[in-house]
Structures are given as structure tokens and as C-alpha cells.
Amino acid sequence: IGKAYSGFQHVAKAPLVQLDSNHFLLELFHGPTLAFKDFAMQLIGQLFQLSLQRRGERVTIVGATSGDTGSAAIEAFRGLAGVDVFILYPHGRVSDVQRRQMSTPSEGNVHAIAVDGDFDDCQARVKDMFNDFEFRDSVRLAGVNSINWARVLAQAVYYFSSAVALGAPARQVSFTVPTGNFGDIFAGFIAKRMGLPIDKLIVATNQNDILHRCLTQGAYKTSGVLPSISPSMDIQVSSNFERLLFEAYGRDGAAVSGLMAALKAEGGFSLSQGVLEMLQRDFQSGRCS
């Protein structure tokens, strides 16, 4: 763990900055690629290497990115033994800084691949690879997107550390989280389920506001992705929202599979009023552009 976070540029790793009497900013940009995903990715890289060295094995890691996941993954795994990394990103839809972070490392085990499409297209290809069991097993496929549970688990830690610094468990805290693929805010939901006294988790979206529409109206309907200056939020199919639905539907896998089938076939689905009200007890949302 110490090695994973040795490259962070602030002694607190995730410092809190007070903006007003009850308003604080949690700074998550002190990692090596300046992305919050460094918190999980740096740890996962070290855990992968430790496990693979003990077993004498090699794996192939694939991931999809709108920018920050890819640069964080390549930085975390570059030069590590036993790992080959392939990151798919949408051509022309990541920032120039992140494109350079992904494409300029010289280590032979990391590869950035531009895809003609958007992030959802990249993510779909990664899911297809994992669903092709023969291919998955032949190349020993592993993932670093937030479909990997370790990503979510590692991100839950700073919800605990920041809430405790602000007075938890005696004091409730709410978190507003810029949200695209729903992984970071889902980590907050897991922290709440573990007993952290979180009042509300507030989903902040841009014009790609499918999550805001779903949490306020109960309809999860896809539309075209609108490019913005925040490409990690330019997403229509939020993978970790499926995990939240699994909890909201009482861990009924068949019910959630039906919703996902409707999403694929019809471009959306509607929540029951009971499920919507259940989600609204924990979540609020807002949109800005």
C-alpha cells in the first residue's frame, strides 16, 4: 500500500479544503496522472504484481476509457512484470493531455488503441471480450474498469477518511460527485451500506444527463453522446448503475437482466415507482452544462 501511494504529491493524499461553514472540497487530483482514478489504479497495479509474482503467471488487461481510466491504468501498470495492458479509447474524444499520457510511455507492456466511436462503443467491446469465455480464458483476461470490484472497493476508502475527518459517525455527511460511469458514487453507496453515516449522495451530471433523468423521472433512456470538456462524463450506459439496480431490486438477477436486455434492444427501460422512491432515499441529482 505504501508503494502504491508513494507517487502522490500531497502528504494527506486526499486533503479536504474548506470552502464555507459546512462546505468542503475533497481533492482527489494529487496522484501521478492528476485523476481520482489513481487512488484505485495505483493500488490495483501493486496487488496484481504481487499476486502474479507469487503464482508465476501472466495476464492480459483490457480496459475502456474516456481518458482518465486509461491514463491512470497505463501509469499504474507500465513496466510491471507479468502484465500486458490494452486500453481502448474513442478517437478524438479524449483530452490531448490524456491522449499523450496514454500514447507516450515507452514500456512494451502497455498499449493505447484508438477506436472510431464513443466511450460506450469501447466499453461494449471490452464487455464482449469478457463474455467470450474461450477468448477470455485463452489470454487470461483481466479488467481495470470499474467492472473490477477492487476499483470500487479502493474508492470507498476516501469516503470513510473524509467523513471521519468531518465528524462522522456523530455527524452526517452528504457527497456531491461528478458522475459518468457511476463507479465513484457507487463506492459512496457501498460505504453507506457498510455503516458510514452518509445522508445524501448527489449525482452531478453534464448535458449527458441520463442518470439525472432516471433518478428524477424513473426513465433510463439513451440518446446520442454529446462531447464536452469533461469526457469522462460523456457516457450514456453507466456500468455501475446496473450494480445499484441489483441492490434496488433485492438482488434479483433475473429482474436486472430483463432491464439490461430492454436497454440493449429498445434503448432504455423504466423503473417501478417503488424502486424509484427507494433510490431517491439515498440519491439526489443535478445537471449543468
Locate the predicted segments by residue.
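PLP-dependent amino-acid enzyme catalytic core
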Residues: I1-S289
